């Protein structure tokens, strides 16, 4: 087999894989859109774009359910987790990357050990703790768990990314009279924008997709998040509200999509700045 034939086969396999992957991703989206916009109440998810389309399911979502409460609850939690977690892991990652202090290596290893414990293994402990301190049905407790759960691995990731920024940049800035805060905020931080964008997106997405924690810790129907609220539409096999579920799922994806497109420029600018400074 010559080189040109090998390249052609490689290209065919690549396109075939990407086509199959696209089908796997797009097909469920089409089913969801079909169920959300099709007239009538379907008893099951179906890919059927025939007939009339309507926005009534979206209207019913806000008029007949607590979806607006769930939506606002999730946004508040997601924004809080994103801001606080990104701030904490950025400062922690920078500290581990640039400074040497007592217990540095041991604490990094401890972070890895904590990360090995699955969330499901701690559900009972979270519930008991919430009962003891009166934190059941409280957003601050749920937010704290999300933040704490994301700190160990994300601190490692941020440290690794800070390590890629040459220390010569810090030394040059220090010679010019820059202090620690200025070096961090004005010089190093712009170079790690790609990882900051990834961290922000991950932290923001977590409350939208989590079901177990909110199911355990939130009790009042009006204080639920989107994941638990939407599940209630299809939890009863005798009265499944597939159309409402699909409409709610589409709206739930919008904030994540908006944030992704908003952060895209940070990927590009951060990578460009890194190439220029390095």
From Swiss-Prot:
Q: Which domain of life is it from?
A: Bacteria
InterPro entries associated with the record:
BP-dep_ABC_trans_perm (IPR050901), MetI-like (IPR000515), MetI-like_sf (IPR035906)
Q: How does it sit in the membrane?
A: Multi-pass membrane protein
**Gene Ontology terms: biological process:** maltodextrin transmembrane transport; maltose transport
Where is this protein localized, as stated in its record? Cell membrane
- SUPFAM superfamilies from the entry? MetI-like
Q: Which UniProt keywords apply?
A: Cell membrane, Membrane, Polysaccharide transport, Sugar transport, Transmembrane, Transmembrane helix, Transport
The GO terms this record gives for MF are: ABC-type maltose transporter activity
Gene Ontology CC annotations of this record: plasma membrane
Membrane-traversing stretches: 12-32, 74-94, 108-128, 131-151, 183-203, 242-262
Q: Which Pfam families does UniProt cross-reference here?
A: BPD_transp_1 (PF00528)
Q: Which family does it belong to?
A: Belongs to the binding-protein-dependent transport system permease family. MalFG subfamily.
**What subunit structure does UniProt give?**
The complex is composed of two ATP-binding proteins (MsmX), two transmembrane proteins (MdxF and MdxG) and a solute-binding protein (MdxE).
Name of this chain's protein = Maltodextrin transport system permease protein MdxG
Q: Please tell me the species this chain comes from.
A: Bacillus subtilis (strain 168)
Classification lineage: Bacteria, Bacillati, Bacillota, Bacilli, Bacillales
> Which gene specifies this protein's sequence?
mdxG
